[in-house]
Swiss-Prot record:
The gene is glgA. One of its GO terms (cellular component) is cytosol. ADP-alpha-D-glucose binds at K16. Keywords: Glycogen biosynthesis, Glycosyltransferase, Transferase. GO terms for biological process: glycogen biosynthetic process. Synthesizes alpha-1,4-glucan chains using ADP-glucose. This is Glycogen synthase.
Length: 488
């Protein structure tokens, strides 16, 4: 049985700031169902350790690394049979607040480099069998900058396992000062532009890109995009150089957590073959959010209120859509000026526009089920999960044709009626977004056309089964001595 160590900085339901947490829960479980022994490595955040203690788990080993006392806990990811290892270092990971990266004022923890440097060191020690555990991986799968130093620390070991590094969002690179590089005690040989130096800064993510045996990202389109100056965040040249090792594998979703036929967050359930209760979900959502219960088109948005998610474009189209009678249900948090602009919109349009700041898992499900149209006008989107959730729930998405949105949403102007499941705009402007929403609203008026779009979306396969199989093929080929995904 192939053993995989899946190193991540967040995993649902223990800690979540975005899609990484969902992937880190569902992909390892899918790999286990394929017969892999996939175990997760996670920093020992308070919520994770609390869950471990409540489950009766215990420390497996305790040691000192440099100035830090470290313990390793073995437990299970809640609700699954997947083994979860927790790196318990109170000095670095016992922090207040819900975010693993920021304090309660929204500022990055000053010692994030030290925190995830230690996480990388412990990951490498576990991978090399140096912690006295009766388990050692054949593959170490690292995710985003927080675990990107693990391949660096394994590079000089002759018997190190193969490494895979997945880019979930290239915009987050783990950049720190040269002084921090020195403080971490990293060897001077790594301070070179072809290794960890990036325009005078230490780049954690370059560790994964330069030293891993294979690189993946979360959609085929994003794999192409990040090799261009427009999406490469200064690393496009390196990624073009590594293109033979770079693979775009589309994310899946947990189709048990996201299932309109049995969703515990919904009062009414429905499916592709019996869609009637979707309107009941909408009425309940309108009541919950203080919106008028009527037949008006309801547009939903769930995500971070930041420029990347196209909030400036969205703000440019909300008012004219409200004026024509549309309703909005918005859930998220982010930049202060976007929050204030949306609050003003809610005050101006009571009963028609709702904003819930923060993140609420249950409400996210209810918006996904209750809306007619789901908006994802992202400037860039490595994969995106919300559009797949909305498709599965028969809520027709309107998206910007980038990254994984381009790979999962198919416009009737570009595809056959049998394939079309949403609306795509290509030009990066508010006018293009407005035009796509207008087309969606027009389609909604034609019941047969709308029902076909919903049906196509709901019957799509968004599960991890095939996507996990692509990772499994990559693992097998790495162990066999090459980094191809598809076997001959």
């Amino acid at each position: 049985m192939t053993r995989v160590l899946f190193a991540t900085s967040e995993v649902f339901p223990l800690v979540k700031t975005g899609g990484l947490a969902d992937v880190s829960a569902s992909l390892p479980e899918a790999l286990c169902r394929l017969g892999y022994d996939c175990q997760i490595l996670l920093p020992g955040y308070p919520a994770a350790l609390k869950a471990a203690r409540e489950a009766g788990s215990r420390r497996k080993t305790r040691f000192r690394y440099g100035q830090y006392d470290v313990s390793l806990w073995q437990t299970r990811l809640p609700g699954t049979a997947v083994t979860l290892w927790l790196v318990d270092c109170p000095a670095l990971f016992d922090r207040a607040g819900d975010s693993p990266y920021q304090n309660e004022e929204g500022e990055d923890w000053w010692d994030n480099a030290h925190r995830f440097h230690l996480f990388g060191r412990i990951g490498a020690m576990l991978a090399l069998g140096q912690l006295g555990l009766a388990w050692r991986p054949d593959i170490v799968h690292c995710n985003d900058w927080q675990s990107a130093l693990i391949p660096v620390f394994l590079a000089d070991s002759q018997d190190a396992p193969k490494t895979v590094f997945t880019i979930h969002n290239l915009a987050y690179q783990g950049l720190f000062s040269h002084e921090t590089f020195r403080a971490l005690g990293l060897p001077d040989s790594l301070w070179r532009y072809e290794f960890l130096e990036f325009h005078g800064q230490l780049s954690f993510i370059k560790g994964g890109l330069v030293f891993s045996d294979a690189i993946t990202t979360v959609s085929p389109s994003y794999a192409d995009e990040i090799q261009t100056p427009w999406f490469g965040n200064g690393l496009d040249g390196l990624l073009r150089h590594k293109s033979s090792r770079l693979h775009g594998i589309l994310n899946g979703i947990d189709t048990r957590q996201w299932n309109p036929e049995a969703d515990p967050h919904l009062e009414f359930h429905y499916g592709a073959d019996y869609p009637a209760n979707k309107s009941q979900c909408q009425a309940r959502l309108q009541q919950e959010l203080g919106l008028e219960v009527c037949g008006a088109p309801l547009l939903g948005f769930v995500g971070r209120l930041v420029e990347q998610k196209g909030l400036d474009w969205l703000l440019g189209v909300i008012k004219p859509l409200l004026e024509r009678g549309c309703q909005f249900a918005l859930l998220g948090s982010g930049e202060h000026h976007y929050q204030e602009s949306l609050k003003a919109m809610v005050r101006e349009w009571p009963g028609q526009c709702s904003l819930t700041l923060g993140y609420n898992e249950g409400l996210a499900h209810r918006i996904t089920a209750g809306a007619d149209i789901f908006l994802m006008p992202s400037r860039f989107e490595p994969c995106g999960l919300n559009q797949m959730y909305s498709l599965r729930y028969g809520t027709v998405p309107v998206v910007h044709g980038v990254g994984g949105l381009n790979d999962t949403v198919f416009d009737p102007n570009e595809e056959t009626p049998e394939q079309a499941n949403g609306f795509v705009f290509r030009e990066a402007t508010p006018d293009a977004l407005h035009a796509a929403i207008t087309r969606a609203l027009a389609a909604r008026e034609d019941r047969k056309t709308w029902r076909k779009l919903q049906e196509n979306g709901m019957k799509g396969d968004y599960s991890w089964k095939n996507r996990a199989g692509e990772y499994a093929a990559l693992y097998r080929n790495l162990i066999a001595g090459n980094d191809r995904i598809h076997e001959d």
